Amino acid sequence: MKCSVLQMSRLSWAMCLMLLMLLLLGTAQGCFIRNCPRGGKRAVDALQPTRQCMSCGPDGVGQCVGPSVCCGLGLGCLMGTPETEVCQKENESSVPCAISGRHCGMDNTGNCVADGICCVEDACSFNSLCRVDTDQEDSVSARQELLTLIRRLLVNRQYD
């Protein structure tokens, strides 16, 4: 059985086209940590390493919980403000970050990120499980004020 030049050309062309389709399929399924669909990179395996989410907000008291969402206990949640710009850098990392906070939401898939606010993969909502006791809130607020004062003193102190 002889293969003509035309048949070889068609076969090569078909192989190249198939290779190109596989390449496009592989790159189209890639996504950043924060904007993947459910079951994407956010579906973290228990054995996969994670890191703490980046600090954000005034004096770094919050944590990034989305590409332009920063939440913290004494802070609440900031969305789309200059303080949240640092959260865009979360998309650049290939290692997912773990949002700290008590579990909340349906099937405990979310985390309490601020007083009364629970965030899951793609949304935040009010949740009574995330309410902070007034005594505990006062203690956290006083501790944050003290740390802020110490930081300012250290920055303003001139060493000889």
UniProtKB/Swiss-Prot annotation:
Signal peptide (residue range): 1-30
Cystine pairings recorded for this chain: 31-36, 53-97, 56-70, 64-87, 71-77, 104-118, 112-130, 119-124
Alphabetized InterPro entries for the sequence: Neurhyp_horm, Neurhyp_horm_dom_sf, Neurohypophysial_hormone_CS
Tissue-level expression: Expressed by the venom gland.
Highest taxon in the source lineage: Eukaryota
Keywords: Amidation, Disulfide bond, G-protein coupled receptor impairing toxin, Secreted, Signal, Toxin
Localization (cell): Secreted
Prodomain positions: 40-47
Keyword Zinc: no
GO molecular function, one term: neurohypophyseal hormone activity
Modified residues (Glycine amide): 39
Predominant cellular place of this UniProt entry's protein: secreted
Any single GO CC term annotated in Swiss-Prot or TrEMBL for this entry: extracellular space
Entry domain remark: The cysteine framework of the conopressin is C-C.
Family, similarity comment: Belongs to the vasopressin/oxytocin family.
Miscellaneous comment as given in the Swiss-Prot or TrEMBL entry: The letter 'R' in the name 'Conopressin-R' proposed by Kumar and colleagues stands for the eighth residue, which differs between conopressins.
Protein role: Targets vasopressin-oxytocin related receptors.
UniProt-recorded name of the protein: Conopressin/conophysin, isoform 2
Provenance organism: Conus monile
